[in-house]
C-alpha cells in the first residue's frame, strides 16, 4: 500500500511539473499570438491609410510611383499572409497544449482521487492497528495491575497474619514475663521470710 501511495505521489508530482511547463508554454503562445494580431492590425491600417494618401495628393502619386507601391503592398500582403499562417500555427499549437493540459488535469484528478482513496484506506488501517495494539496493551496492563493487586492483597494478608502472630507472641511473652516476675517476686519474698525465720530462733538461743 505504501508503495502504491509513493507511486501515486510521484506521478502526481510529475503531472504537476508537466502542467506547469504546458501552462507556461500556453501563456507564451498567447502572448505571441496577441503580438501577431497587433502586427497584422497595424499592417492593415497602414495598407488602408496608404491609398487615402494617394487620393488626397495627386502630385504625390507620381512621386510615390517610383517607390513601386504595388510591390510594397504585395510584400506587405505576403508578410500579412505569413503572419496569419504563423498565427494559425501558433493557435494550433496552443490548442494542442490545451488538449495536453486537459489530459494532464484528467490524469492528475484521477491520481489525486486514487491517492485520497488510498490514503483513506491506509489511514484507517493504522488507526485500526493502533487501536488493536492499544487495546491489547491496555488489557495487558489491566492484567498486570490485577496480578499486582492480588500480590499486594496476599502480602497485606501475610503482613496482617504476621502482625497478628507477632502481637500474639508479644502478648504471650509479656504474660510469661509478668508471670516470671510474679514468681520471682514470690520467690524473693519467700527467701526473705525464710531468712527472717531462721534468724529469729538463733537470736532466742543466744539469749
From Swiss-Prot:
Residues annotated as coiled-coil are: 70-102, 162-192
Q: Which GO terms describe its molecular function?
A: protein kinase binding; protein-macromolecule adaptor activity; small GTPase binding
Its GO biological process annotations read: negative regulation of hippo signaling
Gene name? Sike1
Question: Does this UniProt record's set of keywords contain Glycosyltransferase?
Answer: no
Keyword match Cytoplasm: yes
Purpose: Physiological suppressor of IKK-epsilon and TBK1 that plays an inhibitory role in virus- and TLR3-triggered IRF3. Inhibits TLR3-mediated activation of interferon-stimulated response elements (ISRE) and the IFN-beta promoter. May act by disrupting the interactions of IKBKE or TBK1 with TICAM1/TRIF, IRF3 and RIGI. Does not inhibit NF-kappa-B activation pathways. Associates with the striatin-interacting phosphatase and kinase (STRIPAK) core complex, forming the extended (SIKE1:SLMAP)STRIPAK complex.
Name by which UniProt lists this protein: Suppressor of IKBKE 1
Quote the subunit structure annotation. Answer: Interacts with IKBKE and TBK1 via its coiled coil region. Interaction with TBK1 is disrupted upon viral infection or TLR3 stimulation. Interacts with CDC42BPB. Interacts with SIKE1 which mediates association with the STRIPAK core complex composed of PP2A catalytic and scaffolding subunits, the striatins (PP2A regulatory subunits), the striatin-associated proteins MOB4, STRIP1 and STRIP2, PDCD10 and members of the STE20 kinases, such as STK24 and STK26.
Family indicated by similarity: Belongs to the SIKE family.
InterPro entries hit by this protein:
SIKE
User: What GO CC terms are in its UniProt record?
Assistant: cytoplasm; FAR/SIN/STRIPAK complex
Alphabetically ordered keywords of this record: Coiled coil, Cytoplasm
Q: Where in the cell is it found?
A: Cytoplasm
Q: Which domain of life is it from?
A: Eukaryota
What is the source species? Rattus norvegicus (Rat)
